[in-house]
A protein has these predicted regions:
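Sec/Tat signal peptide C-region and signal peptidase I cleavage site
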Residues: 16-20
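Bacterial N-terminal signal peptides
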Residues: 7-15
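Short, conserved alpha-helix that lines the donor NDP-sugar binding/gating region
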Residues: 33-37
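Bacterial N-terminal signal peptides that target proteins for export
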Residues: 1-7
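Right-handed parallel beta-helix/beta-spiral solenoid domain characteristic of secreted/periplasmic
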Residues: 24-31, 45-56, 60-112, 132-136
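Glycine- and acidic/polar-rich repeat regions and solenoidal domains
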Residues: 54-59, 84-91, 103-127, 132-416, ...
Length: 491
């Protein structure tokens, strides 16, 4: 009996140790890759050989564990280029993808990287240190996502994404099934490089949810990302779900705003918005209920209206899902605004959007400018807003409204170029110490160069175009991202 029990225990130990020693399988062809994926279990790695993999539709599936994930990686990070008509789909649990470069091609499907394979989703999985550069469909109006996040508990981190020219969100969190809701995804330390103006909706860099699922909680964390020259449209980040956190992100010379478009109970904190004096650069736009915007820093933003440094929108009575819920119970606290163009209350007020912000509070914010310029714009009644402890210097207070105090504030310029109230002023005002500015080099990958958006992607000056009578042809009028000023000589 004892010998039989010992034999059974021995078999159990052997079964439990099948993948105790991780196996690396080097694949040099698509066929070898498929075989390697089929053979891999917890702890194993599938390694793509260095070189160009053209017209390669990658399907990476498996069931790893938290302690022993299954990994797909480049033999050498940056030396494996996925080109032509190619994409990547991953599905299963505890999968990791690392070190790939997508360039010189486009996806034949609706995503370049998808955390799903048909109906099968990815959970507890990660895409890291991967590059997508200019991987655009041939037609500008042809739509795709570069990364589609499905499932739950996935992470997208330390990736480099730049040069999207065609329609579609760069990174979309999709909530179209219960298995992808309340997902607890984490999106962090990514470099979102230049994206020129698309000229229409569909040019967001990040979108979390969509209108039909906007009452759903996503619970996604977007933190420590670097957005540079992300000017695809006025919504750089489009939040369309609830319970999300946007924290310690940096926006540099990006023409648009972080927009709480739909969804409730979202938090925007410790982010930095640096406009560099570029037209159209914005901060945060607030819509819906119970949004919190605190401890953020805004400097040199030249946007107005929907792209103001701060905009609280008017809402639509009995709003359908795809319009604008009223701003209710918002908390705008302890933010610092330096040399920005506009702060707008009741943005978008018109015959449809008739509900001004209500039951909302702006407290402890600091507004620094020069020459007592007019900064605040009330486009609708503001009696639903409470202002307490806000300080202005070099900015005209909101006329006839209590809760703004004009005071000379000592200033200092930090080593990173930000202008802050100095230490004495911070102590007097009860401000916390400046948050360390996330460095560009801390995001993305170390082995792929980051471009210069001020040269390649800065919005062009308007091109004057003459319209011949009866014909309009703009095909030769400008380059991608150009702003066109149309002159009709018939008038």
């Amino acid at each position: 009996m004892r010998s039989r029990l010992a034999a059974l225990l021995g078999l159990g130990a052997l079964a439990g140790s099948v993948h105790a020693d991780a196996v690396e399988r080097l694949a040099r062809t698509p066929e070898a890759f498929k075989a390697a994926v089929r053979a891999s279990g917890p702890g194993d790695s599938v390694v793509l050989a260095n070189g160009v993999w053209r017209d390669f539709e990658i399907v990476f599936t498996g069931e790893g564990t938290a302690a022993q994930p299954i990994t797909l990686r480049a033999q050498t990070p940056g030396k494996v280029v996925i080109s032509g008509k190619s994409n990547l789909r991953l599905a299963g649990r505890h999968l990791i993808v690392s070190g790939l470069t997508f360039k010189d091609g486009f996806s034949p499907s609706s995503e370049v990287i998808a955390f799903r394979q048909d109906a099968a989703l990815a959970f507890d999985s990660r895409v890291t240190e991967t590059v997508i550069d200019g991987f655009n469909k041939p037609g500008r109006a042809a739509e795709d996502y570069w990364i589609g996040l499905y499932g739950q508990n996935n992470r997208v981190d330390h990736n480099h994404l730049q040069g999207k020219l065609n329609s579609g969100v760069t990174l979309a969190v999709v909530l179209s099934s219960p298995e992808s809701q309340q997902n607890h995804h984490r999106i962090d330390h990514n470099y979102f490089g230049p994206r020129p103006p698309l000229g229409s909706n569909g040019g967001e860099t990040i979108r979390v949810g969509t209108s039909p699922f906007s009452r759903t909680r996503s619970l996604t964390v977007i933190e420590d990302n670097y957005f540079e020259g992300c000017s695809g449209e006025v919504e750089i980040v489009s939040n369309k779900s609830g319970g999300n956190i946007y924290r310690r992100n940096v926006f540099v010379r990006s023409q648009g705003a972080l927009v709480l478009r739909h969804g409730e109970d979202n938090l925007v904190e410790d982010n930095v918005f640096l406009g560099g004096g570029l037209a159209g650069t914005g901060g945060v736009r607030v819509i819906n209920a119970r949004q919190t915007v605190r401890d953020n820093y805004f400097q040199g933003l030249r946007g107005d209206g929907f792209a103001a440094a701060l905009a609280l929108m008017n809402g639509v009575p009995n709003s359908p899902l795809n319009r604008y819920d009223q701003v209710l119970d918002a908390r705008i606290e302890n933010n610092i605004f330096v040399n920005v163009t506009a702060v707008v209350f009741g943005a978008g007020a018109d015959q449809e959007r008739t509900l001004p912000p209500a039951r909302s509070r702006l407290s402890g914010n600091v507004f620094l400018g020069a020459g007592d310029k007019a900064l605040f714009k009330a486009m609708a009644p503001i009696d639903g807003l409470t202002f307490t402890g806000n300080v202005v210097d070099g900015v005209a207070p909101l006329e006839g409204v209590a809760g703004f105090h004009a005071s000379a504030i000592g200033r200092e310029t930090l080593a990173d170029g930000r202008v802050y109230p100095d230490a004495a002023a911070r102590k007097t005002l009860g401000l916390k110490e400046p948050v360390k500015l996330l460095a560009r080099e801390e995001t993305g990958v170390a082995w792929y160069p980051k471009g210069d958006p001020t040269i390649a992607f800065e919005r062009a000056a308007p091109a004057r175009v003459t319209i011949p009578v009866g014909k309009l042809d703009l095909s030769e009028a400008g380059h991608a991202g150009a702003a066109l000023e149309i002159v009709d000589q018939r008038k």
